[in-house]
Amino acid sequence: MTASPSKLAQLRELSVVVADTGDYDAIKRLQPVDCTTNPTLVKKALDLPVYADLLERELAWGRAHGGDDRTTTVDEVADRLTIGVGVKLSALVPGRVSTEVDADLAHDTQATIAKARKFVAMYAERGVPKDKILIKIAATWEGIEAARQLQLEGIDCNLTLIFNRAQALACAEANVFLISPFVGRILDYYVAQGQTPASIDEDPGVVFVRTVYNAFKQRGSSTVVMGASFRSTAQIEALAGCDRLTISPDLLEKLDAEHGELPRKLSPGNANNAQITPIDSDSFASGLAADPMATEKLVSGIDTFAKDLHALRKTIADKLAG
């Protein structure tokens, strides 16, 4: 008797599976289509033996090019390591690698555009074309406006920290390639408020992603919906059929070990090609202001990403000084 396929194998038939990690060996083992990175994952990755040569090479570059402006040197080494990790990962996955623009630029449209262009150029210098990467940007109004311009230049973007319908619709109206609504962090907020859902179908993170997915499909939007920030395999299973799902290695391993039927929960249905109403900065701001959860989680998410980047830079500074 043939063993039934794992839930991970079944999920691959319904959604594009993305690994939320920079762990080279985990990606090699789990074989996702895409992978997503951030400064924390890059910092963790640099502790792995597979990246030892990259780390030493870029630290040597930093020591050779370090002038009086130590901060600039550290920032440049952080960028070079971030791209270096992405280059190695791009050779492993058939699809895209998401690389994050500095979170401390989240409210600066022009600086975000400049950093995105720099990253694309750095990848190109290392033989990775722009159709292998996604530039990850926090979904502030300024970030979305940066993505609007970058998309016109053929630079595909992943707008992250999506917690609110106004954010999602603004991204779709800007023709952003992909958005990442954060399932787990939405749930975290309501659980902290004493509002634990009675069932997975009432999980506010799951409900939000389903709502956005259906709204996009009904409007004929080409923007990809990629569920992110999962706390359990139950949340993932509840979104089977979503365009893409970015999942940590531990949850991918659990899905690979589980069997039993995994039914489709989301389907494109019949899109009616309705237009998405343009959202201006005022309606975007009012949409966020009316949503305490989204306001809190966007601010804290940017702050966490910024702290993670600063931690990466501190690690580099310490190694350069050592």
UniProtKB/Swiss-Prot annotation:
Keywords: Cytoplasm, Pentose shunt, Schiff base, Transferase
Subcellular location(s) per record: Cytoplasm
Coiled-coil intervals, chain numbering: none
Gene Ontology BP terms: carbohydrate metabolic process; pentose-phosphate shunt
InterPro entries: Aldolase_TIM (IPR013785), TAL/FSA (IPR001585), Transaldolase_1 (IPR004730), Transaldolase_AS (IPR018225)
SUPFAM superfamilies: Aldolase (SSF51569)
Enzyme Commission no: 2.2.1.2
Pfam families per record: TAL_FSA
Catalytic machinery residues: 136
Major location category of this protein: cytoplasm
Enzyme class, first EC level, given as a word: transferase
A GO CC term assigned to this protein in UniProt: cytosol
UniProt pathway annotation: Carbohydrate degradation; pentose phosphate pathway; D-glyceraldehyde 3-phosphate and beta-D-fructose 6-phosphate from D-ribose 5-phosphate and D-xylulose 5-phosphate (non-oxidative stage): step 2/3
SS bonds (residue pairs): none
Catalytic activity: D-sedoheptulose 7-phosphate + D-glyceraldehyde 3-phosphate = D-erythrose 4-phosphate + beta-D-fructose 6-phosphate
Family: Belongs to the transaldolase family. Type 1 subfamily.
Assembly and oligomerization: Homodimer.
Known role: Transaldolase is important for the balance of metabolites in the pentose-phosphate pathway.
Protein name: Transaldolase
Species name: Xanthomonas oryzae pv. oryzae (strain MAFF 311018)
Lineage, uppermost ranks: Bacteria, Pseudomonadati, Pseudomonadota, Gammaproteobacteria, Lysobacterales
